[in-house]
């Protein structure tokens, strides 16, 4: 039998014929390791001198001939499971029909071995059959960390360890993972941790890696000393540092826990210096930290030496530019830093970025702004100099999108304000990034610039798909709503097309009589809504929405049932402004009023809602009895001397409106330039609409000016929210928010029908917190809830970032709002009383009645959290308003907390799924 074995590292006597090998009686060497291969190669060294080479040539007369056995007839792989034969063929680069070549096979074996999956690889050749033999490494079937953390924390550690399920087992990789785990634990503040590694065989060639962690203790900085500091307080000095002195009750949110973060300690000196430079101390010098640790108590003292120097003010600001593509006056006007200001390094950086933006918006993407300082130490003055190198005009070469596993490229491209061949613009680049974030499709968005040459640039758009679909079910119980079930299916990015769809249903069984005067089963509700929205029809700036809805609910004072449909067409004006026009047809029926007197607001003047009620004086009754006559009923209005106790009450309209039909057109305008969907830090949001039900006319309502309905009015409404991140001013993660809204209902004459459920009510998360949703309302002389013909609310909020990793914030708020209504008598504008004298027929009619207002205010705290279920707000409000008296002689001046005004106040609210 003719046989040749080829090692991965050496081929012995390749020029010796197969016959010579057999005649020599030598046996093929099975070289299975680099060490053995090296030893064998030394034994089979080629002859070193000419005589030896001649003798070798005599012994191998057929060395220049290729025997048939050396031609490859087939290739096979023995013991290979990590990859397919096809992939192995691509790696070895040997094909059937090739002539056996030692170097080629050696290269092939090494290429296979270098894949990292095998302990050893060798090749054999017999009868034209080339076989590669593999001894594969074990696979990692799983990685477990025992003795530390939650599953989320463990996943975070595993990502840092560089070892995961499916990897090949490797001792060096294992040791690296062990070291990385210890380092990660130290980074979290745990020192002296012990990590032991063990392996468990799961199956043949599969191992479970278990890291047993004996977590060390945290070291706390009990005291931080800044020797030489006199002009800044310790808390200010430490404001940017990762390592700070532990506060009293430091475990509470918002306080310094004092944990030692050793991996950040070397950078804290620079952070402290930056704090000083933000306050004008340009000569400040901070020593390297000295840490003294007591491992018996796990307490530490942190010591720095500080040289503060003098505080500098800005004497002058100069701008030097090599190519004045933007006028110097324009650049100077854009700067925030002013002469005579205390120098602030943060403002210097911000102004450098402003100058960069001004130049880059003209297309000069590679412009460089180099700030320089000219100090006058004697007088404590500094001259700020900005040197600008403009560079070449830059155009976009290509836009490369990655990370969108579900969302199609065109959905992303249509939000970008820059495309191939466009002139570069930095502001448009940032707006494009913000526009992608506002979609709410992605959890991460980043646009990077890649330079092609001095005049071309690629834009690399990297996104990470977020949760755009929601399937929610809720179950709860409340004193008002009873057993509550709700469910919704919504998708903001349907099949990756950018379209949105939602199906919503809400059911509440009702909790009975929660408050005096409410109908039995108050709180019972069923509501359903189906909507489909395409925000960009055919990738144009036009959008469309179709929705169907129906509802049945027992409200505070009546039962409402109805339904309808709506269609809407809109258009984007730029990338921030949206305008739409929609049509809506709604049929609503109100019944089951808590008081029959509510019928007067749906009935005609010909219908008696409540008959006249009378009483007979006692003297008349006694006289009739003494005369032997039949006594009259005390409540009879026909008896002689009867006194009217309650007049006859009729409806107020010219016809019956118990089932009104509303046919309306709505014009809507919205604007949004915020930088995030859920947690905006900067920017404004504005939206407004005008709904015209019927056509304006001073005459009687008919089918034409009612647009097919019998409701006629124009309702205008707008809301505005502004956000500003105060971190650059206060050095803490604090967001200031201001939100306001206002609306009014205009009617053309006092006979135009106005539904009670279309007026404005206050109370709840979206208006004035601390009052039950929709429970603040003007009342008529009978105490009936009418709502207002106008509304205005304003809210101020300060939101502090408590846990950045958990996306949790704590906010303080102050809410104020009022509702307007008409009364028959003149009086002061603000009119707070348990019972007002609102005249509903005059609502919204210019010149009819007198405009009054009832106002409320509240303050409190709220916790804001992007939870796994979505945005969640927990609200703890305190309601108050100004009341001059409580009806019992007790006077109140100024702001009165929780007065007795028959308001339904509450001290806890929550909201899910809304923007903050």
Curated annotation (Swiss-Prot):
Main location: membrane
Gene Ontology BP terms: membrane assembly
Protein function: Part of the outer membrane protein assembly complex, which is involved in assembly and insertion of beta-barrel proteins into the outer membrane.
Disordered, as annotated region: 21-70
Signal peptide location: 1-20
Record keywords: Cell outer membrane, Membrane, Repeat, Signal, Transmembrane, Transmembrane beta strand
Signal recorded as keyword: yes
Domain POTRA, first and last residues per copy: 70-137, 138-214, 219-309, 312-391, 394-466
GO cellular component: cell outer membrane
Taxon lineage: Bacteria, Pseudomonadati, Campylobacterota, Epsilonproteobacteria, Campylobacterales
Protein name per its UniProtKB record: Outer membrane protein assembly factor BamA
Protein family: Belongs to the BamA family.
């Amino acid at each position: 039998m003719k046989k040749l074995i080829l090692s991965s590292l050496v081929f012995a006597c390749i020029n010796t014929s197969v016959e010579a090998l057999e005649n020599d009686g030598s046996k093929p060497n099975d070289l299975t390791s680099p060490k053995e291969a090296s030893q064998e190669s030394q034994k089979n060294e080629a002859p070193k001198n000419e005589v030896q080479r001649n003798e070798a040539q005599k012994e191998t007369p057929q060395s220049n001939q290729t025997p048939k056995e050396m031609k490859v007839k087939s290739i096979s792989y023995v013991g290979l499971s990590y990859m397919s034969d096809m992939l192995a063929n691509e790696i070895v680069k040997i094909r059937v029909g090739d002539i056996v070549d030692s170097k080629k096979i050696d290269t092939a074996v090494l290429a296979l071995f270098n894949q990292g999956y095998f302990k050893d690889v060798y090749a054999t050749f017999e009868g034209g059959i080339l076989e590669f033999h593999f001894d594969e490494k074990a696979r990692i079937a799983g990685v477990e960390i025992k003795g530390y953390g939650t599953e989320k924390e463990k996943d975070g550690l595993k990502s840092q360890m560089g070892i995961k399920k499916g990897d090949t087992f490797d001792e060096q990789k294992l040791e690296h993972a062990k070291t990385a785990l210890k380092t990660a634990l130290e980074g979290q503040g745990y020192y002296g941790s012990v990590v032991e590694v063990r392996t468990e065989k799961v199956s043949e060639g599969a191992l479970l890696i278990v890291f047993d962690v004996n977590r060390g203790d945290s070291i706390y900085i009990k005291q931080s000393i800044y020797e030489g500091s006199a002009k800044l307080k310790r808390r200010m000095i430490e404001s940017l540092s990762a390592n700070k002195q532990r506060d009293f009750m430091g475990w509470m949110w918002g306080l310094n826990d004092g944990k030692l973060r050793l991996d950040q300690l070397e950078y804290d000196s620079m952070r402290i210096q930056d704090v000083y430079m933000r306050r004008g101390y340009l000569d400040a010098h901070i020593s390297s930290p000295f840490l003294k640790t007591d491992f018996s108590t796990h307490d530490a003292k942190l010591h720095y030496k500080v040289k503060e120097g003098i505080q500098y003010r800005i004497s002058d600001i100069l701008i030097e530019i090599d190519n004045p593509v933007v006028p110097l006056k324009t650049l100077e006007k854009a700067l925030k830093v002013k002469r005579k200001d205390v120098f602030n390094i943060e403002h210097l950086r911000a102004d450098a970025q402003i100058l960069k933006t001004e130049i880059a918006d003209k297309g000069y993407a590679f412009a460089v702004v180099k700030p320089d300082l000219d100090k006058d130490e004697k007088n404590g003055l500094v001259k700020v100099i900005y040197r600008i190198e403009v560079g070449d005009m830059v155009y976009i070469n290509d836009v490369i999108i990655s990370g969108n596993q579900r969302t199609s490229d065109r959905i992303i491209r249509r939000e970008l304000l820059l495309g191939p061949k466009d002139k570069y613009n930095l502001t448009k680049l940032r707006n494009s990034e913000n526009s992608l974030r506002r979609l709410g499709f992605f959890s991460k968005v980043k646009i990077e610039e890649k330079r092609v040459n001095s005049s071309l640039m690629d834009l690399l758009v990297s996104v990470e798909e977020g949760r755009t679909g929601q399937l929610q079910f809720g179950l709860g119980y409340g004193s008002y709503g009873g057993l509550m079930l709700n469910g919704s299916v919504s998708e903001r990015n349907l099949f990756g097309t950018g379209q949105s769809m939602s199906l919503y249903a809400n059911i509440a069984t009702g909790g009975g009589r929660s408050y005096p005067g409410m109908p039995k089963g108050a709180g019972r509700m069923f509501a359903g809504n189906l909507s489909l929205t395409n925000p960009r029809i055919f990738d144009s700036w036009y959008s469309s929405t179709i929705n169907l809805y129906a509802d049945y609910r027992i409200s505070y004072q009546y039962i409402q049932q109805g339904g309808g449909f709506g269609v809407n067409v809109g258009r984007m004006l730029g990338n921030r402004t949206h305008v739409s026009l929609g049509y809506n047809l709604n049929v609503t029926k109100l019944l089951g009023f808590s008081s029959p007197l509510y019928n007067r607001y749906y009935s005609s003047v010909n219908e008696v809602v409540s008959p006249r009620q009378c009483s007979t004086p006692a003297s008349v009754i006694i006289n009739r009895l003494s005369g032997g006559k039949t006594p009259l009923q005390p409540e009879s209005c026909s008896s002689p001397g009867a006194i009217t106790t309650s007049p006859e009450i009729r409806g107020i309209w010219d016809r019956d409106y118990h089932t009104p039909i509303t046919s309306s057109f709505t014009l809507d305008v919205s604007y949004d330039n915020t930088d995030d969907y859920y947690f905006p830090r900067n920017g404004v949001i504005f939206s407004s609409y005008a709904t015209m039900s019927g056509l304006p006319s001073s005459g009687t309502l008919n089918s034409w000016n009612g647009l097919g309905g019998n409701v006629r009015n124009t309702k205008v409404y707008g809301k505005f929210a502004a956000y500003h991140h105060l971190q650059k001013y206060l050095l803490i993660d604090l967001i200031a928010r201001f939100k306001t809204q206002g609306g009014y209902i205009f009617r053309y004459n006092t006979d135009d029908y106005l539904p009670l459920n279309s007026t404005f009510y206050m109370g709840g998360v979206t208006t004035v917190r601390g009052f039950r949703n929709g429970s603040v309302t003007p009342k008529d002389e009978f105490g009936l809830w009418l709502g207002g013909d106008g509304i205005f609310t304003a809210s101020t909020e300060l939101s502090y970032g408590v846990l950045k990793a958990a996306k949790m914030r704590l906010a303080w708020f102050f809410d104020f709002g009022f509702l307007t209504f008409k009364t028959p008598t003149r009086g002061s504008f603000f009119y707070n009383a348990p019972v007002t004298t609102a005249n509903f027929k005059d609502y919204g009619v210019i010149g009819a009645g007198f405009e009054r207002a009832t106002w409320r205010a509240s303050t409190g705290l709220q916790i804001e959290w992007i939870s796994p279920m979505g945005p969640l707000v927990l609200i703890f409000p305190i309601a108050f308003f100004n009341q001059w008296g409580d009806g019992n002689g007790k006077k109140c001046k100024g702001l009165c907390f929780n007065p007795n005004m028959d308001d339904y106040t509450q001290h806890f609210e929550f909201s899910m799924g809304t923007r903050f």
